[in-house]
């Protein structure tokens, strides 16, 4: 169960009306001297009556009741008593740890930092840390985040008078708190986020990682998180912590039934007919305790017969083994800095953002025009994982894709390319060995139809240099770059900055190139720094969340394409762009209709079967080890109605087909809800079969602009209180979600009624970078993610589930295009009428690229290996 200190609705829950609805924005505004900042974006409504009904009568699975029922006013009072019980080791252990180690913990938090505690309480625990910080003379701003003003006032009223520590309240949900931390005035402040009381144990394990990952994204390189985790694996000790000899815990649990009756408005549960069953369940992940209601006899509740042997789950508390804690941190993009434990049963873990964790928030991932040295270090950490851990030594000289150089080329190409650009702009001598520029400057990208046709490239040696020599050279170039940052990023001239920026984005793009090459090899090693996903579980969850793929009317609108970045500019704060991103221009795009999400693996498989196409996309494989052609598929035209449901794929096909991932082959049955990635020619045939076509470059940009407008419109409505976000999910495992499930609402599908023309005034392209929050880019997952729950939402830039997006537009020279001086052949070499523009980004695309609205990528239309998907559009 959560600790009293971490409860959010708190005493506010005692005011729940009999209807089960309580609008927390109507809390009494009590007079208080407490400094409480209202950060709520919208009034929050908790409809427990609906939750009770839906969980008591589930469509599938066992009966449950929302854990939030336990935390009305009386429940909080009872739980406060529980935290003082000898058996309840969680609070006692945490206090012992803080008493002994608070001074050491405080040493990790610098003066001038802010501390944000997720949930407020009686300060019994956090005061120990605040006192240590105050004694150290550190100026600290402490913020207690809670959804209840009354709870914040009560908490802050108990704060002792500190000399250096200032205490504040944040009134809002966890989501509100995260948005507050994302604000420009807060995002760059040093911070430490506290999540005490082992409240993380009330989440399912996958949800716990998702929750933490949300806050990881707002952490800077020097920020920290301090998280309490229950690791007790003594069954008796765990059991008695939740089943005390005095019986207070069972009284606390039974009080939930009394609260349910008040909310329902009738005596649905007769208290005397129910008892509490607590049980400890052992598993290799660390075990858990769970609590149930069980009737003492057969009884009727809300028209349902509940047998005496039936049970209704109300609460669970997961325990974490050392291995599971490490899995949790790595999945959430965190690394452990230090830990303090009480024996083997409880620990406080100090965590920092992993070097490979790329933020999806524009004010973080693009906080300066030039990537920072921290950005470079994160990039190098990722590059080194791919090249030194996943790429076997014996595979370096192989060509997983025959149209590309051997893998070893890319090890030398990345530092050589950067060194060449630095040499051009600094006028200094190249790094040694200088002859590397002859063999590593530029790779090959030949014509798929005729590989003899290829742009100018470096000579291919008879024998590549030894790996050790290449890695030494790599470190030499990295050291050279670090030297340019030695006097501060603001002192780097614009022309040298452009060379650094070009080298940075060049390396970003080649990580993806190397990875999609490695995906074609059965010798690629699984990344070990993150846990292997449970693809079966992920598939079952995706299937349960499917919604129809709706059509949206994209209104006629004028959009901006490109950015302003003069080659001879001197403003170091202006963002850089490649030659194909310039000059900026306005274009008119006619109205059309677009589906909300891209084509999935399942839809593509149905297309193959119905059209009797044997050729699989290169992203798939046959499990019977048949050879897979590396050629291109025959184009297929035709029309097929876009049905919301189709016949099920035959088991014989599913059993023999898999999708390629860095984790090896994943059975197609586990990846049906993923976006398919294939060549343009392959997907164009599928789009025609589905009753549409692939959008043009301008139409795709128009989709992104309109998707942004819809988001802003929805956010404006939230500000006005028209929509209802959920409350803090730390309160319960199943009763309350962090983010409410999607439902067709303001984003009305075109079939019924499209947003009015007046909504087009909301469309804006003044911001260069997109907020990618929730997008599967930037290595937040190392594989595509299910996308079928997004059909009722118009997905925007980078939001296609981990794939780029094809457009039907050929890459051609446009008016005003000028080749860039540093790399004149970057785009110009591909004006051959064979390449189409792609937009967005994949799961392996850095946010600086995936989120930049002006960025343009391209591939040959029949190139089968790139991670590019497509959505279907149609004319009005």
Curated annotation (Swiss-Prot):
Ranges for region L-histidine N(alpha)-methyltransferase: 36-350
Residues binding L-histidine, per UniProt: 88, 202, 242, 315-317
Gene Ontology molecular function: any one: metal ion binding
Uses: Ergothioneine (EGT) exhibits antioxidant, anti-inflammatory and cytoprotective properties, leading to its growing application in the pharmaceutical and cosmetic industries. Also shows UV and gamma radiation protection activities. Finally it acts as a cation chelator and a regulator of glycolytic metabolism.
Region (Disordered): 631-650, 732-761
Catalytic activity reported: L-histidine + 3 S-adenosyl-L-methionine = hercynine + 3 S-adenosyl-L-homocysteine + 3 H(+); hercynine + L-cysteine + O2 = S-(hercyn-2-yl)-L-cysteine S-oxide + H2O
Ranges annotated as biased composition (Low complexity): 744-758
Cofactor: Fe(2+)
Residue numbers binding Fe cation: 413, 506, 510
Recorded family membership: In the N-terminal section; belongs to the methyltransferase superfamily. EgtD family. In the C-terminal section; belongs to the EgtB family.
Protein name, per record: Ergothioneine biosynthesis protein 1
